[in-house]
A protein has these predicted regions:
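Conserved ABC ATPase "signature" region
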Residues: 86-87, 138-156, 262-266
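Charged, flexible cofactor/metal-binding loops and thiol motifs
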Residues: 3-11, 25-31, 248-333
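P-loop NTP-binding/switch modules centered on Walker-like glycine-rich loops
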Residues: 187, 191-195, 199-277
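Conserved ABC ATPase signature
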Residues: 161-165, 169
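A short, proline-enriched helix->beta-strand linker immediately N-terminal to the Walker B motif
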Residues: 180-184
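Conserved ABC transporter NBD signature motif
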Residues: 79-87
Length: 333
């Protein structure tokens, strides 16, 4: 989907200079900090109201940790998370509780994210009970039936336990639970990666239908680039805790500029054998460096085919090389 088709509203979410560092300790009795995992190390991006923003990268790049910081499941080490004018990194107590009604999550694993001891109806109704938005039990149940129907299941599933359902059905329950509080913004943390391929398209189409129906805004975290291209208006690419490229979906997939983005897209198989044989595939050399001791300068330089001496010393700052196309690489002009 092109930038021209994307919503033009002001940003609903703005992430500025986000850092999330975890201490590494050793010892049992007298444990001491011996290092720091820089899971997120200076991330900036915006999400406009009504759009789906993709956040992609290899496993361990920090995309899920970024999502957890936005949800305030983790307290950021530094930076700002401006949601509708309020810095979520700083709020506490009732203010944070109120914001969490507006910001919800769909978890990656539809098996471990549902309580096996609770019936589906109780799982979906629990957020309403906790936040006190629908104290009447009969109205809560009616809302549960409505959400189950909207998510393609139906009221009969309310009395089932999670183990009686398939993976796709469980993920629909997770989606219904995320909708229970009438949120504005949903973090979708790889919501289809644990599902069969035959079910993935159904869930992706459901998410798109719900976005249009309820005016939702998504941060869609994923590593399946074909799903991201189908669903997202804009995409940010992360590598080792940093965003290396941002652009609208069509531009990023058709004209990637950062060497890492180019390598990611080159690794996606093409179903046409003739096209697959004819393209220039250059796999990324080496291994992903440790986030405990990341490389100096550009974190991608040890694996980059375009790296020069400057890349080893100077961390590239994100800059707009074309309208709406931001790249963190000094060798891109």
């Amino acid at each position: 989907m092109s930038e021209a088709e994307a919503p033009r509203e002001a940003p609903l979410l703005e992430v500025r200079g986000l850092h999330m560092h975890f201490p590494v300790s050793e010892g049992i009795v007298r444990s001491k900090v011996v290092g720091t995992v820089k899971a997120v190390d200076g991330v900036d991006f915006v999400v406009r109201r009504g759009e789906t923003m993709g956040l992609v990268g290899e496993s361990g790049c920090g995309k899920t940790t970024t999502g957890r910081c936005i949800l305030r499941l983790e307290r950021p080490t530094a930076g700002q998370i401006i949601y509708d004018g309020v810095d979520m990194a700083q709020v506490e107590g009732k203010a944070l509780r109120d914001l969490r009604q507006k910001v919800q999550v769909i978890f990656q694993d539809p098996y471990s994210s549902l309580n096996p001891r609770m019936k589906v109806g109780d799982i979906i109704a629990e957020p309403m009970y906790v936040h006190g938005i629908e104290p009447d039990a009969a109205k809560r149940l009616a809302r549960v039936y409505e959400l189950l129907t909207v998510c393609g299941l139906g009221p009969r599933f309310a009395d089932r336990y999670p183990h009686e359902m398939s993976g796709g059905q469980r993920q629909r329950v997770g989606i219904a639970r995320a909708l229970a509080l009438n949120p504005e913004f949903i973090v979708c943390d790889e919501p289809v990666s644990a599902l069969d391929v035959s079910i993935q398209a159904q869930v992706v189409n459901l998410l798109e239908d719900l976005r249009a129906k309820f005016g939702l805004t998504y941060l869609f975290i994923a590593h399946d680039l074909s799903v991201v291209r189908h669903l997202c208006q804009r995409v940010a690419v992360m590598y080792l805790g940093r965003v290396v490229e941002q652009a609208d979906s069509d531009t990023l997939f058709d004209m990637p500029l950062h060497p890492y983005t180019q390598a990611l897209l080159a690794a996606v198989p093409i179903p046409d054998p003739m096209v697959e044989q004819g393209r220039d595939f250059r796999p990324v050399r080496g291994e992903v460096p440790s986030p405990i001791n990341p490389p100096s300068g550009c974190v991608f330089h040890p694996r980059c085919p375009k790296a020069v001496d400057r890349c080893k010393q100077v961390r590239p700052e994100p800059r707009e090389v074309r309208p709406g196309h931001i790249v963190a690489c000094d060798e891109v002009h």
